[in-house]
């Protein structure tokens, strides 16, 4: 197992450095109001289109910013950069290389996952490992506003495009319900985003619901490290929980192993508890129950493009269609990806971004949506008060 993990580590470590011609890739850091460090990986093309606002990519639950860049053939980050967009891939708190708990860091090391950026920043940010728990509310109220303000300041653009996968889209739907904040978003691309969970549950969600106590215990004892290590070596094991996250027939084994090795992160008790409550109640609410984010969808007026997969067992077709109907955006679109609409395969939760044909069938639709919303004249010239990053941007060397 150790030998295999080391071999896989070498393979993916090289892949991450390839194919960066035509763009500069850097890591950037900024602190939230409560002192947590957030990381953003910037893909700045040599020629940035003047009429395009920057794009922020936000991963889902249990992943990090590398979800968007596992390999060149499944990298939405590089695809959009080559289309002339200034792309910023965000890691929310708890995800590499943003602030992580000590347990997360140690568990990564135990499976020989030692990303170069983690090694470079670990000694400089020892205080960051003090965080032990966080909720989705923390992402909404602290992480998202900080990331957007940082990108605005660094680029001089008044607004950004936000592309969120799963939880990375849920936090944006919640953020957009505040009109004073919504003005910062030019458009929103919601990829496989469940803002409701309808009963009766799908078979994989039923398994998750019935295994709630075991999931809580497993999260505390071994976290994601054990399944990530096994998945790195064995790939698709066809387990019931796996069917929540991907269609095994629509994803290359090498990419899947890369997902487990590079992008898998720990899920905090707060995150897990909040999302398990959603499975029970059918609604996405704040931890204290005071905010009903599902009920607040009607407050969203930002231009929004919603994508769903025909065999997504987490963000089901019905759940995505529900969000589409509830939002009050005058400009909104919905696309369903699968054989029924001419795609070469049926799409699941993760493979709508990292699937075999996603680059050919999904990415162009996303780019076309973004191109519909050029920034207004002089809007990109509005320089905002700079946000001082917690450490200097580190340029990634080309391989």
Name every feature range the model reports, one short phrase each.
Residues 333-399:
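Catalytic active-site module of serine/aspartate enzymes centered on a nucleophile-bearing elbow/loop
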Residues 300, 306-308, 312:
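Short beta-strand/loop motif that positions the catalytic acidic residue
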Residues 153-158, 163, 167-288:
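Alpha/beta-hydrolase-fold enzymes
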Residues 302, 316-326:
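Short alpha-helix in the alpha/beta-hydrolase fold that links the catalytic acid
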Residues 45-106:
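Short, surface-exposed "cap/lid" segments of acyl-processing enzymes
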Residues 109-153:
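Alpha/beta-hydrolase active-site loop
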Residues 57-63, 165-166, 309-310:
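Glycine-rich His-Gly loop
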Residues 16-47:
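N-terminal cap/lid segment of alpha/beta-hydrolase-fold proteins
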């Amino acid at each position: 197992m150790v030998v295999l993990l080391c071999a896989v580590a070498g393979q993916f470590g090289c892949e991450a450095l390839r194919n960066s011609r035509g763009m500069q890739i850097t890591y950037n850091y900024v602190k939230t109001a409560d002192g947590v460090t957030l990381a953003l990986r910037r893909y700045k093309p040599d020629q940035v289109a003047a009429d395009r606002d920057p794009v922020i990519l936000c991963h889902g639950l249990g992943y990090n910013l590398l979800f968007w860049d596992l390999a060149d053939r499944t990298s939405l980050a590089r695809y959009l950069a080559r289309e002339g967009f200034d792309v910023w891939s965000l890691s929310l708190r708890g995800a590499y290389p943003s602030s992580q708990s000590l347990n997360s860091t140690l568990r990564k090391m135990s499976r020989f996952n030692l990303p170069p950026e983690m090694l470079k920043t670990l000694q400089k940010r020892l205080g960051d490992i003090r965080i032990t728990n966080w909720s989705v509310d923390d992402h909404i109220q602290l992480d998202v506003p900080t990331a957007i303000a940082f990108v605005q300041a660094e680029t001089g653009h008044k607004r950004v495009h936000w592309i969120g996968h799963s939880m990375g889209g849920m936090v944006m739907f919640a953020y957009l319900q505040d009109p004073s904040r919504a003005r910062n978003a030019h458009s929103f691309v919601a990829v496989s985003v469940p803002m409701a969970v309808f009963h009766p549950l799908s078979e994989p969600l039923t398994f998750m619901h019935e295994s709630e106590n075991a999931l809580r215990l497993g999260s505390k004892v071994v976290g994601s490290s054990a399944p990530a290590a096994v998945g790195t070596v064995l790939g698709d094991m066809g387990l019931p929980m796996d069917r929540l996250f991907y269609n095994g027939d629509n994803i290359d084994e090498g990419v899947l192993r890369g997902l487990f090795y590079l992008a898998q992160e720990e899920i905090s008790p707060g995150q897990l508890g909040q999302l398990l409550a959603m499975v029970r109640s059918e609604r996405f609410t704040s931890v204290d129950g005071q905010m009903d984010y599902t009920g607040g969808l009607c407050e969203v007026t930002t231009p929004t493009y919603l994508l769903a997969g025909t065999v997504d067992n987490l963000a089901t077709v019905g759940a995505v269609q529900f969000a589409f109907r509830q939002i009050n955006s005058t400009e909104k679109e919905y696309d369903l990806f699968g054989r029924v609409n001419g795609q070469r395969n049926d799409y699941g939760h993760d493979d709508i971004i990292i699937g075999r044909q996603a680059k050919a069938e999904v990415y162009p639709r996303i780019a076309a949506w973004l191109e519909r919303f050029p920034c207004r004249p002089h809007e990109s010239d509005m320089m905002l008060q700079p946000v001082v990053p917690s450490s200097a941007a580190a340029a990634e060397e080309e391989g």
